[in-house]
Design a protein with these regions (language model features):
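Alpha/propeptide regions of enzymes that mature by internal proteolysis
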Residues: 2-312
Length: 312
């Protein structure tokens, strides 16, 4: 990838740790992560604790308990976690009946020689590690699924598919991150999105920075999207410019062009951060010890997504 020089459109923090996450609900994720870190816990502990907040929020239809089920009415969850300094990673895919897949992903990273466990194997591992079975399907989601199931033409859910992705940077320039989702509503059973795929939904290079991709997971996976953003930062772009460059590169190849559902957050090890999405409306949250805010991302192309919407 050729080196490119552009004006720095990103924002730089002078206060650490820095937490950047997807969507407005990421602010609560960030706040818990900061609280955990300030209690003397590690950056990885902070990432896990922050994401667990979103996984436990039954009002969120796209992550953890209360997530939209698959076509069979079963909630299947995906998650990954990554530790920048050691370049370690753990992930789980299509796991059922476990409330906190982010914590199971961390156990995969720390207790096994593997990177990913999926389906029944992931659930068995979680139970062996002491995680408890949990009913993930709320009554509200069950009724919605029943109504959908009655339709003669069954289409995938068109809204509320929002991954929580959290990137974290400390004063030493070390980076950790994670993401978690229930994925595309009414997906085919066994479908795995980008969230547990390293280089798709999340990528960290501790010498450069980190990026998270959200949107339709198939788009993120087909282009190794988060990896592409980090590589643009390696070439010299600031985080926001790297996000924009990745979108333009993908749009130049994909038949949908700038009608593609894809959104990025990114930060570099110097404390610069930014975000961009196809169309207006993609929000991201930024938290430091001095402030916690929600921003609108840079919009590439026309169109718009609703706040916390248009994302699978």
């Amino acid at each position: 990838m050729a080196t490119a020089k552009t004006k720095n459109h990103s924002i730089q923090t002078n206060s650490y740790p820095l937490f950047v996450s997807t969507w407005a609900f990421g602010k609560a994720t960030n706040n818990k992560a900061l609280e955990t870190y300030q209690q003397g816990k590690s950056l990885l502990d902070a990432v896990e604790a922050g994401i667990r907040v979103t996984e436990a929020d039954v009002s969120n239809a796209s992550v953890g308990i209360g997530g939209i089920p698959n076509a069979d009415g079963i909630v299947q969850l995906d998650a990954c976690i990554m530790d920048g300094p050691d370049h370690r990673v753990g992930s789980v895919a299509a796991i059922e009946g476990i409330a906190h897949p982010i914590s199971v992903a961390r156990k995969v990273m720390e207790e096994t020689p593997h990177v990913m466990l999926a389906g029944e194997g992931a659930q068995k591992f979680a139970l062996d590690q002491g995680f408890q079975r949990t009913n993930l399907l709320t009554q509200t989601r069950q009724e919605e699924w029943k109504n959908w199931h009655k339709k003669s033409r069954k289409e995938a859910h068109s809204d509320a598919h929002d991954t929580i992705t959290l990137l974290a940077l400390d004063k030493n320039g070390d980076i950790s991150g994670g993401c978690s989702t229930s994925g595309w509503g009414y997906k085919l059973p066994g479908r795995v999105g980008d969230s547990p795929i390293i280089g798709g939904g999340l990528y960290i290079d501790n010498q450069v920075g980190a990026a998270g991709c959200t949107g339709k997971g198939e788009n993120c996976m087909r282009y190794c999207s988060s990896f592409v953003v980090v590589e643009f930062m390696r070439s010299g772009l600031d985080p926001q410019s790297a996000c924009i460059a990745a979108i333009n590169r993908i749009a130049s190849t994909d038949p949908l062009g700038l009608n593609l559902e894809i959104y990025f957050i990114a930060l570099d090890k110097r404390g610069n951060y930014g975000a961009a999405g196809v169309g207006k409306g993609f929000q991201y949250a930024v938290t430091t010890p001095v402030n916690s805010q929600v921003f609108q991302s840079e919009a590439v192309g026309g169109g718009s997504v609703g706040p916390e919407g248009g994302n699978r």
